Structure formats: structure tokens, C-alpha cells
Amino acid sequence: MSEEDWQVSRRLFAVLQGGVNSAMLYISRLPPDEREKYKKDFKKRLFDTETGFIKRLRKAEGIKWSFHTRDYYIGYVREMVAGSTTSLSLRMYIYISNPLWHSQYRPGLKNFNKEWPFVNMWIKTGFMWDDIEKQNICIGGEVSPGWGPGMVGIAIKAFSCGERKIEATPVMIIRGEIDPKKWCGDCWNLMCLRNSPPKTLQRLAMLACGVPAKKWRGCCNQRFVSPYRTPADLEVIQSKPSWNLLWSGEL
């Protein structure tokens, strides 16, 4: 490799650490005959970096199956947690932007955080904070001072699908006020978990009235409505644990 090529590669790697927008801006200024070459090289470097991060995160957090999108415009990876090694864990779909996702906020039925981010997942499918840096939560991809370990697994976007959830109750079903089959199986599971006592006939009846949750294989039955999707979106890791006991436990 010539000295000039080495300098270009070194600059490209430095830009990669600074964020994707800067890197693409740098590549766009290259001569046309070099642009495609370095664009391809950059995407490969980015893919390898993100894949390594995701693998380490999955290993550290015990995530057994997941799918994820790569939101390049932010400059760091967001992983969508879709399941864990715990048989009692809830299938809860949350984008996280930092590997500080520990037991305090991990979605399980015994250590379940009922206030945040569940409430945000319940009422909103967009960004929690569009001005996340001004909120002094996360600056430049790093968690701001004052947030202890386990406090910030920043849920920027969280939802099971785009259908709006409601406070459904068994009485509403009996009266015919709602159609349980309007929602997908995953949404209906969440609604039943939120609005029925654990290990009760009411919960089992509510679950039976809805659409059964589909097995996630090959491709999920939802789509993420985002203008920032990439060809690597919806990569599915097909080794999910059993989830027969999704609705057991206490909230």
C-alpha cells in the first residue's frame, strides 16, 4: 500500500469513529473513480464494527434471539431486543442505544419496570426525545454524567407494531366493545399482560380471544416504519427459546 493510500485509509478509519454522516461526506468529495471503492470499503468496516458490537451485547446480556436495524444517521448501533434466555421473559421489543441494559430495566415478568420504558412503548411509536443531547441523557453516543450503571439503556424507539394499544379489559370483550382480533398476537399479549391479573381465568380467556402470536422465523410479521432502513434491516437470528410461559408471573 502506498503512503498516499495509507493516509486515505487512516483518515477514513478516523472518520468512521466520528460518525457515519462525516464519513459519507468525506467519501462524496473523492474523485468519482475512487468514490465507489471507498464507499464499499467503508460499508464493510461499518458492518464489521456493528456486528462485533451486537455479538458482544448479545453475549453479555443473554439475548438468545433478536433482530435489529442499523440507523446509520445517528452514528452508533441500536439493537432491538426480542428475547432472552429466561423462559419467563416477555417478548418486548425495544431499541437500545447503549449496552448499559442491566437487570434494573431488563424486560422480565418478575423484575419488570412498569413505569419506564414500558409506558413510552405503550403510548408512542416514535422517538422519545428528538433533542436527546439537550436532555443531557446521551451526548455523542456516550451516556452523560449522572446516570449510573443499569439506569440508561436509552429506549429511543419502542413498539411491538404500529397498531395503537388500548387499556383492554375482559368486560370490554364481553360487551363487544372491541374486537380482540384487530391486533396482532404480540400486541394482544402485551395488552393482556398489562390489563389482567396473572395466572387467572380472565387472562387465559383474554388471550384465547385474540390472534395467536406467530412464530418468528425468517422474517418478522411486522415492519418498521422508518425512512432510515438499510439493506441489513430485519436480520433475524433464529434460535429463540421456548415462550410457553410468556404470561405467567407477576407484574
Curated annotation (Swiss-Prot):
UniProt keyword Transferase present: no
Pfam families in alphabetical order: Lentivirus_VIF (PF05851)
Swiss-Prot/TrEMBL GO biological process terms: viral life cycle
Family annotation (InterPro entries): Vir_infectivity_fact_Lentivir
Location, primary (coarse class): host cell
Key words, A-Z: Host cytoplasm, Virion
Species assigned in the record: Feline immunodeficiency virus (isolate Petaluma)
Protein's name according to its UniProt entry: Virion infectivity factor
Family membership noted in the UniProt record: Belongs to the feline lentivirus group Vif protein family.
Keyword Aminoacyl-tRNA synthetase: no
Disulfide-bond pairs as recorded: none
Residue runs in coiled coils: none
Function recorded in the entry: Determines virus infectivity.
Localisation: Host cytoplasm; Virion
One Gene Ontology term, aspect cellular component: virion component
Protein origin, superkingdom: Viruses
